[in-house]
Amino acid sequence: MSQITSPAAYSISRPQDVIDIVNKNSAVNTSIGIIFIALGGILIDAYQAAMVGFGNKYIAVQFGISPGLAATVNASVLVAALIGGLLANRVINRFGQKRAFIIGMGLCTIGAAAVAIAPNIWWVLICRVIMGFGLGIDFPLATNAVAELRGSTSKKTGSSVNLWQMAWYVSTTVVYLVLLPLLLSGVAEEQLWRYGIFVGAIFAVIIMILRYVFIGESAMWAARVGRYEEACGILARRYGVHARVAAPSPSQSISSEKAETKFRGGYGILFNSRYRKRTILGCVVATMQAWQYNAVGVYLPLTLAGILSGGLTGALSGSALVNALCGVTGGLIGSLILQRLGTRLQSMYGFALVTVALLALGALATTNPWLSLGLLGAIIFFHSAGPGGLGMTIATLSYPPTIRPTGVGFARAIMRTGAIAGLIFWPMLWGVLKTEAFYWLAIVPFLGFLTCVLINWEPLGANVDAEDAEVLAELEK
């Protein structure tokens, strides 16, 4: 009788061994549900951003400040998220993926629950800063977790990471679907933002629980901090891979200790000769898309209120429809065609089409309200299908695991400057120039287009994880 033998176990003695295993093997369960759970912090980020954008004018009235100052206070979450993104790598390296997920979403939950009962504008400011730190920490975690689940060289990894853009618009649509029943149930219009933000805090708690159960710890992190037995357990449970710990050589032990002392670094490497162009491309794509979105997408309900009849109910219904038809659909189509076009070309085409749509809107906005609505929908669609999610996708797929959270956190931090610019400066520009402001806004996607033309880097399918040993060696210097 023949005996069935199990496959030979992998032997691991250094972090690169675990990285290579994860790179070659997708997790056993990488369903769309698991991907969305990993991207859960982005859902909360989108939800709270849209909710506070909706509540901006009500916050100004309730606390006796100007709409411009209210927008500045609300934008404090972006400044805090910028700082949180820069600190994300330290938090992840210190606490690991599992606890860092709890820290990020925990801060967001506390801030959201507290801002819902804010008695004054200073309370709002402090709570928004707390939320921002949490969201800034969470984003690099989320995209890094998806990359680990899929394996960085898998053809599905780019599409999975880029699903965060579709997730963003799903969450934004949920905002309006939450506000509508609250409004119809008799909640005072000026109190809607408080109820909506509190509902967001409940969503954040649910995301925390789901992540704790279904995502867990990172095998790569466990290996980097020397917990090889734990890494073997994670590989067995999540990837169905059998691995055993081999005794490291003395030189590997010394190298590991040196790397651990230097592990908090990494920002300098983002601009060395190998990674400079990758960093610039990811940051510019991310920043320009954030600028154009926060100028158009965040103020969509206010724009539609001037186009459609039906008051606030009509504006909320129209916003939900535009986000669902154009944003969600665009994000889904963008993920499906990503393998064919690649991140750079898809970003380039998206920026070009948004530029054309903005120029058309500047020329034709006053001719027909429904034409304006169609052009706004086109901007949302081409943004979502094109560069909307690809700045972060480029950042996630351009760096090996040791500096991946650093690269994503840095790109996300720089991206926040574009979001702040769109959120604060667009209303000022609109107040002075009205529809002619669209001409000036078209400069933003055009700069993104030029960057994609000039920098020829395509991370999709590149085996960047193989560069991890070299990065660790550079960190030791």
How should these model regions be labeled?
Residues 2-477:
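Transmembrane-helix signature of 12-pass secondary carriers
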